[in-house]
């Protein structure tokens, strides 16, 4: 344990010092400090006057309290003086109130006006919002009025039905949190909690009565202005009906009822008769169902379907169809069934084991060649390629497959295959030297690709004995150069042309400047590479060799006559080195402009500097 403490003493010591700081007794320290203050004696005037710290502190505290009291007393005196001055001025001023008690300083604009109270005569008894019954009997218990449904707070479940969300998806409020969604709008723009007074059905009866009067007088779709005014005077402000939003028939025009409010659409007067009788009976039936509050549901407006117009126009077969339009249903018709001919369905993958039929479809190339050229016109030039535009894609596909098969056959057969083919061709030429008509499946080209037509059918002319020899399968390829088709030759030429033209297409302003710089700096750099290496001592020896004796003067221009510019620079550096070694002396004419190109050299010694240092002895050593 002691070993561990001795090893980690430098780590434990700060912790011990920190614990000692918490063991300090503050009271004891203060007591010791006070004792030291009592023992300390500070005297002035040779010991006559002594100083005590406690007395000095009390003296300072007392002087501060006295000073603060003096400041407060001075503050109160200042305010008393100000009050006295203001009261004195007020007493000296004459009073503005006269003997009659009228104040001259005050002005009254409506002094002589009589007091008028708010008149209540303009309130119409018909337009009151309070309905009182004459036979009303006071009950002992007061009935608490029901809270309007518009003021009843909705439940949380109802709020979740139609929430109002922000752009971030946060739920801000609900539809029923706004009064405009729970109250009834008034024509004046206010939102009413509940309808009071007449119901919307009474307004409908009044309009119907006006229509009956207008029918008896022979007027249609019009109401006299007097009756209209009477109707407006009879209506209550709170009983004005609200316009009904029509969602049943949006495209139908608005019906004019003579009032201009558009509360309920009514039928035209021209259609009076059985319809009006039925409507009147329906209204009478609905009257029986009115409750005590006087509210009934309005009749649902019958949806009028527009009669479709008969189209006599001929349909346009090229017109673009509407994807959302309901198409005319057509009966299903059974189509014709076509069977695939034998040979086409053989390539289809099927798990059923079927017997292969011996009959197959005719080869397309044979059929196409026989159709395109029947062999009777052997001497005439034939057209290049197929004559049918629909067969062109299939034709070129078959040609590419044949060319690929020929290349593979050339690689496998090699030189022996070519020898056998040449022998067979020679035998055929000996048998029939005249030109025989070619096979039907042989296609000939008159274009540039006709160079490979001689070896086009090499695979078909190979005898069976050569094909079955196992030795021919081991022959190494690359004995013959593959015959190129016309398309590949064109493709190679185009690629070569593009590669050569890229350097012209990629030339920019920067590349032109770089090329000019290379053309300019290339010869100079090559010339500098051909220069010999610079040896300053060698050039110094050459410069001193041009002097015949010591002390002779020569201008630098005369020494550098017929020298190359780079040689002059090298000799200049060598002359400066010689002047530093005190081998030559450099001088020029005075003046800035006059001293140009007037450098002259005088030879001081023909011995080299390093040779002089070998035989040099210091003056201190030579004197000894």
UniProtKB/Swiss-Prot annotation:
GO cellular component terms, A-Z: condensin complex; nucleus
Region Disordered: start-end pairs: 429-457
This protein's UniProt keywords: DNA condensation, Nucleus
Highest taxon above the source species: Eukaryota
UniProt biased composition (Acidic residues): 442-457
Pfam family name, one: CNDH2_M
Localization terms from the record: Nucleus
Subunit note: Component of the condensin-2 complex, which contains the smc2 and smc4 heterodimer, and three non SMC subunits, ncapg2, ncaph2 and ncapd3 that probably regulate the complex.
Family: Belongs to the CND2 H2 (condensin-2 subunit 2) family.
Protein name as annotated: Condensin-2 complex subunit H2
């Amino acid at each position: 344990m002691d070993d561990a403490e001795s090893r980690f003493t430098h780590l434990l010591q700060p912790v011990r010092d920190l614990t000692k700081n918490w063991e300090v007794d503050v009271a004891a320290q203060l007591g010791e400090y006070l004792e030291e203050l009592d023992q300390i004696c500070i005297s002035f005037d040779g010991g006559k006057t002594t100083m005590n710290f406690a007395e000095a502190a009390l003296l300072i505290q007392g002087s501060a309290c006295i000073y603060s009291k003096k400041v407060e007393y001075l503050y109160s005196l200042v305010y008393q003086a100000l009050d006295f001055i203001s009261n004195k001025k007020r007493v000296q001023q004459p009073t503005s109130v006269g003997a009659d008690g009228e104040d001259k300083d005050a002005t009254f604009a409506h002094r002589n006006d009589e007091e008028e109270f708010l008149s209540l005569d303009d309130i119409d008894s018909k337009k009151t919002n309070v309905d009182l019954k004459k036979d009303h009997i006071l009950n002992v218990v007061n009935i608490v009025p029901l809270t309007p449904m518009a003021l009843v707070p909705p439940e949380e479940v109802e709020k979740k039905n139609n929430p109002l969300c922000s752009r971030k998806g946060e739920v801000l409020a609900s539809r029923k949190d706004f009064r405009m969604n729970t109250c009834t709008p008034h024509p004046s723009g206010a939102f009413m909690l509940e309808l009071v007074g007449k119901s919307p059905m009474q307004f409908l009866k009044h309009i119907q009565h006006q229509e009956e009067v207008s029918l008896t007088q022979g007027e249609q779709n019009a109401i006299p202005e007097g009756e209209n005014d009477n109707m407006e005077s009879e209506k209550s402000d709170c009983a004005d009906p609200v316009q009904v939003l029509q969602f049943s028939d949006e495209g139908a025009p608005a019906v004019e009822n003579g009032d201009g409010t558009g509360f309920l659409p009514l039928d035209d007067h021209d259609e009076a008769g059985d319809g009006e009788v039925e409507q009147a009976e329906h209204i009478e039936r609905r009257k029986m169902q009115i409750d005590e509050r006087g509210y009934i549901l309005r009749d649902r407006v019958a949806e009028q379907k527009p009669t479709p117009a008969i189209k006599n126009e001929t349909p346009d077969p090229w017109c673009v169809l509407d994807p959302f339009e309901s198409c005319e249903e057509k009966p299903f018709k059974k189509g014709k069934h076509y069977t695939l001919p034998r040979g086409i369905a053989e390539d289809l993958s099927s798990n059923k084991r079927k017997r292969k039929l011996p009959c197959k479809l005719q080869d397309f190339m044979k059929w196409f060649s026989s159709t395109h050229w029947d062999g009777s016109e052997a001497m005439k030039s034939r057209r290049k390629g197929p004559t049918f535009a629909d067969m062109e894609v299939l034709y070129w596909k078959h040609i590419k497959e044949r060319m690929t098969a020929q290349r593979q056959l050339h690689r496998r057969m090699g030189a022996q295959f070519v020898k056998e083919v040449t022998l067979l061709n020679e035998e055929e030429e000996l048998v029939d030297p005249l030109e025989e008509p070619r096979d039907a499946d042989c296609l000939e080209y008159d274009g540039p690709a006709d160079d490979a037509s001689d070896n086009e059918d090499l695979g078909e002319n190979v005898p069976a004995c050569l094909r079955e020899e196992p030795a021919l399968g081991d022959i190494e390829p690359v004995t013959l150069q593959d015959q190129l088709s016309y398309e590949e030759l064109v493709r190679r030429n185009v690629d070569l042309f593009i590669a050569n033209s890229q350097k012209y297409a990629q030339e920019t302003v920067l590349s032109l400047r770089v090329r000019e710089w290379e053309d300019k700096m290339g010869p100079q750099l090559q010339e500098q590479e051909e220069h010999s290496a610079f040896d300053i001592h060698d050039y110094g020896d050459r410069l001193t060799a041009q002097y015949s004796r010591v002390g002779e003067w020569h201008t630098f221009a005369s020494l550098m006559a017929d020298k190359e510019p780079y040689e002059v620079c090298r000799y200049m550096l060598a002359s400066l080195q010689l002047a530093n070694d005190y081998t030559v002396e450099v001088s020029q004419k005075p003046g800035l402009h006059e001293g140009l190109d007037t450098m002259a050299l005088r030879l001081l010694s023909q011995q080299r500097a390093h040779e002089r240092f070998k035989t040099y002895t210091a003056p201190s050593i030579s004197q000894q």
